[in-house]
């Protein structure tokens, strides 16, 4: 963001010097009671904020654009600038203007960026605001994520695909990238992220290690389990450097850094995350899985639930433990309600204690902190009495913070103000001098009321009143109708339209006493409040621990409420490779159906021995895609620790979920539907394991029929013959694939049943054994309102195609799976079919040369019209 240099007053000289240090930020420059922006910054700010754009020095050579707003409105305007993608440098007055005869000293006190903010208006309570950092190593990429508002700090490293998955899951608001890798970043991860490019020297291992160990006050990083993640360490060091550069130096709430262990969680590539619409959708109005399952009652719980959804577990012991807690609360709903009522009273503990660390917490927010800690005590007591071991462990681990709660209770007034400057935050009895000064202030105000009453009676001016303003302090206001009654010793200070204002010696004397007391009161309150905040900061770790435990409990209780509301059942996790779902339902679709319309549940059974790949045929709109998605979502929910929408589920752990559901063109990157489809499918085929779940829908539909059939056949065969033998659901409209069961024993044919009535079809949406012989595409077109003439033509062409296309021509010689022969005449163009009919109907023995030439010319004309 370039700003034309302005050579003028000392103020503008000071502005220019500061602006040069932050050329790419919008500089909010404090001038008196306003934050001002100048030049290009002013033009941008006025557009984004809808504030007036004026000129400073209008008509002079130093004329520049100017836009500003009152300093007390910063929490209204700052979020709008940040959400517009701007980096905002807040430049404050660093000294009291009354105490200096020269220009006030100013400096940037905070640089707020999309990924670095503690402003509640910028943040979303149930969503982390992650700042990410990327380091491109020789073979692997390091990544780090930090939410400065909660203190969560995570790192990992891996190949491009893994890092891409993490970026999709964590959705950082801003990503730090080395300048030398600007092109690499855009090439590998696209340009949908808000990136900021740092100098390359920041990304050095020695510098990063030193930065991290200095922050955590340790000799090494072994205790965090990340010492071998060289690329992850480098990325993490860059994040701490960036915090320092943005003037975020009070970060003692960042107490640890955790490794994201790739092998601990279910693998889902970005295609799967997108296709299943877990928490994002290309359609802004679509309902996601998170929208349905989030019954959390606290901000911490909401953020943790999203993390659990992004990173489902593979550890059967932990999964079963979560299921047991859900079952316990489901069976003890009286206790469930008591815990829910307490969690509702808990504020955002993570972000409150982070504000304590940064010194940005208000008196009222400290009261919220205390009330939240109070609400934890009954939860701790209930949990300790529980016969359920995991619940008891949570109760045992919760910190009662008795001293902290008592300290806040005795130090602050229960009705503490939103800002310390508002006064009356500190409770009585804490500081003798403060109590004395408050007494003077209160008595002084009573005395002023006495003066008002006395002077009113003495002068006979009943409407006389004593007021105060910042210009000339306390004054007596008299309406013009009583002006003639004013005593001569009163001193006139101001004339208004309907009144005049006066001061007296007595008023000035008491004003000095009162204002002196109030100024001293403010100083003492500020001092005591700062001491309290520093003392609370010693409790950062216990409060963060409580926040984490309450978040876990909130997630598990959310699962319980979900199960109660929607009749979910506990999945049985075993050591097998099988997946056995009885009457499974789609958790999102079933909630979108009109009242009274039941969701048609379906069974799905997959294993590696008898039914490894289910080939599902059926028309469009019949529900094939829903069955595929619901299978994946049931597995995901189970491995998050939730109950599932089914009659029963027995399953072995799934370690990877792959989906290719529906076509989604990546036009902006110049890729066709078919190319995108092949890229996604290649990702699956290159990463499958023996515990993978593969869901393929309409593979090959982005190309011609024969290419499509060939590719779909080859992929299905590859999955069947692969040593991993991954469990697979394969939905297709290529009915020719039903013939694969004759040569590939672990493939079974199913179809989504359709009832064919006289001239319409009824979608039953039930998965039944056996292949489907028709696609009912013309029926679907009719339901969509296709013109009758088009439908009639389609029927005619369909009959002709069905007459001439044999199954053997498509599947090749039966039983020969290695050599699929496609007949040269089985072309999917109706015109070519018509020409073929013309040629086959010719009687060559009776055809004259002229007739032959005429027929050839006719065929040529037909082709030239094509």
From Swiss-Prot:
Cross-referenced SMART domains: MUTSac (SM00534), MUTSd (SM00533)
One GO CC term on file: cytosol
Coiled coil regions, renumbered to chain: none
Residues the record lists as binding ATP: 618-625
GO-annotated biological processes: mismatch repair
Free-text function comment from the UniProt entry: This protein is involved in the repair of mismatches in DNA. It is possible that it carries out the mismatch recognition step. This protein has a weak ATPase activity.
Family note: Belongs to the DNA mismatch repair MutS family.
Matches recorded under NCBIfam families: mutS1, PRK05399.1
HAMAP family recorded: MutS
The protein, known as: DNA mismatch repair protein MutS
Species in which this protein is naturally found: Flavobacterium psychrophilum (strain ATCC 49511 / DSM 21280 / CIP 103535 / JIP02/86)
Taxonomic classification: Bacteria, Pseudomonadati, Bacteroidota, Flavobacteriia, Flavobacteriales
């Amino acid at each position: 963001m370039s700003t034309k240099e302005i050579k003028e007053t000392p103020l503008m000289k000071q502005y220019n010097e500061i602006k040069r240090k932050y050329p790419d930020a919008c500089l909010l420059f404090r001038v008196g009671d306003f934050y001002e922006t100048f030049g290009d910054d002013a033009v941008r700010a006025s557009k984004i904020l809808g504030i007036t754009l004026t000129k400073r020095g209008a008509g002079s050579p130093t004329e520049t654009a100017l836009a500003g707003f009152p300093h007390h409105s910063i929490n209204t305007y700052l979020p709008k600038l940040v959400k517009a993608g701007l980096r905002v440098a807040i430049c404050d007055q660093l000294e009291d203007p009354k105490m200096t005869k020269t220009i006030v000293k100013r400096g940037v006190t905070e640089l707020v960026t999309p990924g670095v903010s503690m402003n509640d208006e910028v943040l979303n309570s149930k969503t982390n605001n992650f700042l990410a950092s990327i380091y491109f190593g020789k073979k692997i990429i390091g990544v780090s994520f930090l939410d400065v508002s909660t203190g969560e700090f995570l790192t990992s490293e891996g190949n491009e695909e893994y890092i891409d998955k993490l970026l999709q899951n964590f959705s950082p608001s801003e990503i730090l990238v080395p300048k030398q890798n600007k092109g690499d970043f855009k090439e590998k991860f696209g340009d949908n992220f808000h990136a900021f490019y740092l100098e390359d020297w920041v990304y050095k291992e020695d510098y990063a290690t030193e930065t991290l160990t200095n922050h955590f006050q340790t000799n090494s990083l072994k205790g965090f389990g990340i010492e071998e993640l060289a690329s992850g360490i480098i990325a993490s060091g860059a994040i701490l450097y960036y915090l320092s550069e943005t003037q975020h130096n009070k970060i003692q709430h960042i107490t640890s850094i955790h490794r994201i262990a790739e092998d601990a969680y279910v693998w889902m590539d970005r295609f799967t995350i997108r296709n299943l619409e877990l928490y994002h959708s290309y359609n802004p109005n679509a309902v996601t899985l998170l929208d349905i399952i989030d019954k959390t009652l606290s901000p911490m719980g909401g953020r943790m639930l999203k993390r659990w959804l992004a990173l489902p577990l593979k550890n059967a012991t932990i999964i079963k433990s979560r299921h047991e807690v859900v079952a316990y609360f489901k069976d003890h709903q009286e206790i469930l309600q008591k815990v829910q009522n307490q969690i509702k009273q808990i504020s955002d503990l993570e972000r409150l204690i982070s504000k304590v660390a940064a010194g940005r917490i208000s008196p009222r927010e400290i009261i919220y902190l205390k009330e939240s800690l109070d609400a934890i005590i009954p939860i701790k007591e209930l949990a300790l009495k529980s016969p359920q071991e995991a619940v008891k462990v949570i109760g045992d681990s919760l910190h009662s913070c008795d001293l902290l709660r008592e300290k806040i209770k005795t130090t602050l007034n229960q009705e503490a103000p939103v800002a310390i400057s508002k006064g009356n935050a500190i409770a009585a009895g804490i500081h003798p001098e403060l109590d004395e000064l408050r007494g003077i202030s209160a008595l002084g105000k009573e005395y002023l009321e006495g003066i008002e009453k006395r002077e009113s009676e003495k002068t006979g001016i009943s409407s006389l009143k004593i007021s105060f303003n910042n210009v000339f302090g306390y004054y007596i206001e008299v309406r013009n109708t009583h002006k003639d009654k004013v005593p001569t010793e009163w001193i006139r200070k101001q004339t208004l339209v309907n009144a005049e204002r006066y001061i007296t010696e007595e008023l000035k004397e008491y004003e000095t006493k009162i204002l002196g007391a109030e100024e001293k009161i403010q100083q003492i309150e500020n001092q005591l409040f700062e001491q309290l905040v520093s003392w609370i900061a010693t409790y950062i770790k216990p409060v963060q621990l409580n926040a984490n435990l309450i978040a876990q409990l909130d997630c598990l209780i959310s699962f319980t409420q979900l199960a109660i509301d929607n009749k979910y059942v506990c999945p049985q996790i075993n050591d097998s490779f099988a997946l056995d779902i009885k009457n499974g339902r789609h958790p999102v679709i079933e909630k979108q159906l009109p009242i009274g319309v039941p969701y048609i549940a379906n069974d799905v059974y997959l294993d590696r021995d008898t039914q490894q790949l289910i080939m599902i045929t059926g028309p469009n709109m019949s529900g094939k895609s829903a069955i595929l998605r619901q299978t994946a979502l049931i597995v995901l929910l189970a491995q998050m620790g939730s109950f599932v929408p089914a009659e029963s589920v027995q399953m072995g752990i799934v370690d990877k979920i792959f989906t290719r559901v529906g076509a989604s063109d990546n036009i902006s990157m110049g890729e066709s539907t078919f190319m995108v489809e092949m890229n996604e499918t290649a990702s699956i085929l290159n990463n499958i394991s023996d515990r993978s779940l593969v869901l393929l829908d309409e593979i090959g539909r982005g190309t011609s029929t024969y290419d499509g059939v060939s590719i779909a056949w080859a992929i299905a065969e590859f999955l069947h013959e692969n040593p991993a033998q991954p469990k697979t659901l394969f939905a297709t409209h290529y009915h020719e694939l039903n013939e694969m069961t004759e040569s590939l024993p672990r493939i079974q044919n199913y179809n989504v049943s359709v009832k064919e009535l006289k001239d319409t079809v009824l979608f039953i949406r039930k998965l039944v054994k056996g292949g489907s012989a028709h696609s009912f595409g013309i029926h679907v077109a009719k339901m969509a309102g296709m013109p009758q003439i088009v439908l009639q033509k389609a029927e005619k062409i369909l009959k002709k195609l069905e007459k001439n296309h044999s199954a053997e021509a498509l599947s090749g010689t039966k039983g020969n799976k290695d050599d699929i022969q496609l007949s040269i005449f089985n072309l999917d163009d109706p015109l070519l079919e018509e020409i073929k009919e013309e040629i086959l109907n010719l009687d060559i023995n009776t055809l004259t040369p002229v007739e032959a030439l005429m027929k050839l010319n006719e065929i040529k004309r037909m082709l030239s019209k094509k």
